[in-house]
């Protein structure tokens, strides 16, 4: 009786906090329904954007980004896989591909009859990656001009074949060009494109739980204030060109909390999420402004990062004022092979951690994390406070690297280098081990012991065979 009463009180408190519940099913709903579990809406847009609980049906896919919710809880109901907020534009008509010279194929992105999924238009066709859904394979190497389509799997997007370094805001992104021996949609392939956009953005005082985000070319989650993000899967993020930037550059983070001098994205928690295959970092606190800047209470706790360019990136810089963190942390997370992000664009900054801090950092703690198979820190001048982290680094990777002072790099080539790194970090609680890329037994043990619950995701994404095959490869 006591338990039942407590349960009723808990439900009442939840209803008071977020308001009336609404249910949404893309596979079995209708926007003319009342939004009850028995008669769900079809689209998220049909539900209120303020003071509501919004439950998305498990196993369903919701195409297009969501934005602008306030005082809401967004969760899942039913059985099966997490509901997916998806930005993928899916080729349904293989004949839409036109073969050009030198094994280059072209598809017109403006023809809705040739696509399923999210039909992006205009600058949303600033494609971040080409993705074979059937093989779970990413083709992420975007070239800067048509005549740079040199390797199979390269792609380029523009309305004019003569364009170079597509970054101008006037670009219309009409055609996607892809180099392939055969029609890209042949042989059982199911080709899709990650479209330019942010999966979830502009949330205030919201909770998002047990929802997946996939296939957006800008960020997975960004621009949030006072929010909690739990048990989410964020995959295949980034790669779009940053339009209007002074030079050609791509972008794309899993979770980004931007710091401005007017409205910093403070008071956010990301917990128990899995972030994979991001063009840039899995998680970041970053920002540049003119006035005084303060970011408070942003925490990444207990998350898993798989093949992101970096697991965590941080920088807060003010041109004319102060820039500070307060009570921010990246703790108890685990990262697998940061830097191997599958976008085929290796850079010197590929590492577990990335800092662009120009001044000493306080109020930001990196603690109790586990990193496998990546360089440690790409650092400009100052690191965050480090405590009790564990790094397994391959012998051909670095421990710290500053692109402005490459001569000061410390490479993972000896135990003496490890001691130098300890001195650089200024603490003796971090553990650093130099690992052999060919040590498959260690790899298997790390996956099974340190990445419990994520073993299948790691083996699928990284194409790692099961233990028995690993052992046979080592034997031969």
Where are the language model's segments positioned?
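Bacterial N-terminal signal peptides
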Residues: 6-14
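Predominantly extracellular beta-rich ligand-binding scaffolds that present long acidic/polar faces
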Residues: 63-73, 80, 92, 316, ...
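Boundary at the C-terminal end of the N-terminal hydrophobic targeting segment
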Residues: 15-19
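Extracellular polysaccharide-degrading/modifying enzymes targeting complex plant/algal/animal polysaccharides
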Residues: 23-223, 238-252, 256-258, 412-430, ...
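Low-complexity, Gly/Pro
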Residues: 58-59, 77, 88-90, 216, ...
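Short glycine/acidic-rich loop motifs that flank beta-strands on beta-rich extracellular proteins
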Residues: 63-66, 195-201, 216-223, 234, ...
């Amino acid at each position: 009786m006591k338990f039942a009463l407590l349960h009723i009180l808990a439900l009442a408190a939840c209803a008071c906090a977020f308001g009336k519940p609404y249910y949404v099913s893309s596979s079995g709903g209708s926007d003319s329904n009342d939004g009850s579990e028995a008669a769900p809406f079809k689209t998220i847009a049909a539900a209120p954007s303020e003071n509501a609980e919004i439950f998305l049906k498990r196993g369903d896919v919701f195409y297009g980004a969501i934005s602008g919710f306030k005082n809401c809880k967004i969760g899942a109901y039913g059985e099966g896989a997490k509901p997916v907020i998806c930005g993928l534009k899916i080729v349904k008509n293989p004949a839409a591909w036109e073969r050009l010279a030198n094994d280059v194929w072209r598809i017109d992105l403006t023809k809705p009859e040739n696509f399923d999924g999210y039909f992006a238009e205009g600058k949303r066709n600033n494609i971040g990656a080409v993705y074979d859904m059937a093989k779970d394979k990413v083709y992420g190497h975007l070239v800067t001009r048509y005549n740079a389509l040199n390797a199979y799997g390269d792609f380029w997007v523009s309305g004019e074949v003569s364009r170079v370094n597509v970054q101008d805001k006037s670009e219309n992104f009409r055609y996607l060009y892809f180099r392939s021996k055969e029609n890209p949609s042949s042989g059982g392939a199911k080709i899709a494109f990650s479209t330019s956009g942010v999966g979830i953005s502009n949330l205030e005082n919201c909770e998002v739980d047990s929802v997946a985000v996939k296939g957006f070319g800008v960020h997975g989650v960004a621009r949030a204030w006072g929010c909690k993000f739990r048990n989410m899967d964020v995959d295949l993020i980034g790669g779009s060109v940053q339009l209007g930037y002074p030079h050609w550059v791509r972008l794309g983070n899993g979770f980004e909390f931007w710091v401005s001098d007017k409205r910093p994205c403070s008071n956010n928690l990301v917990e128990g999420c899995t972030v994979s295959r991001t063009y840039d970092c899995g998680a970041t606190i970053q920002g540049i402004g003119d006035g005084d800047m303060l970011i408070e209470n942003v925490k990444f706790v207990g998350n898993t990062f798989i093949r992101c360019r970096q697991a965590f990136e941080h920088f807060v810089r003010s041109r004319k004022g102060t820039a500070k963190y307060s009570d921010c942390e990246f703790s108890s997370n685990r990262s697998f092979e940061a830097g191997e992000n599958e976008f085929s664009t290796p850079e010197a900054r590929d590492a577990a951690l990335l800092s662009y801090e120009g001044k000493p950092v306080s109020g930001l703690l990196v603690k109790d994390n586990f990193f496998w198979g990546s360089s440690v820190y790409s650092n400009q001048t100052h690191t965050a406070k480090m405590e009790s982290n564990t790094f397994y680094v391959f012998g051909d990777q670095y421990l710290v690297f500053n692109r402005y002072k490459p001569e000061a790099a410390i490479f993972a080539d000896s135990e003496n280098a490890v001691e130098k790194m300890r001195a650089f970090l200024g603490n003796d609680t971090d553990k650093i081990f130099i690992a052999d890329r060919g040590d498959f037994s260690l790899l298997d043990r790390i996956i099974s012991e340190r990445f419990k619950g994520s073993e299948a995701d790691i083996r699928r994404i990284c194409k790692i065979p099961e233990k028995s095959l690993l052992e046979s490869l080592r034997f031969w």
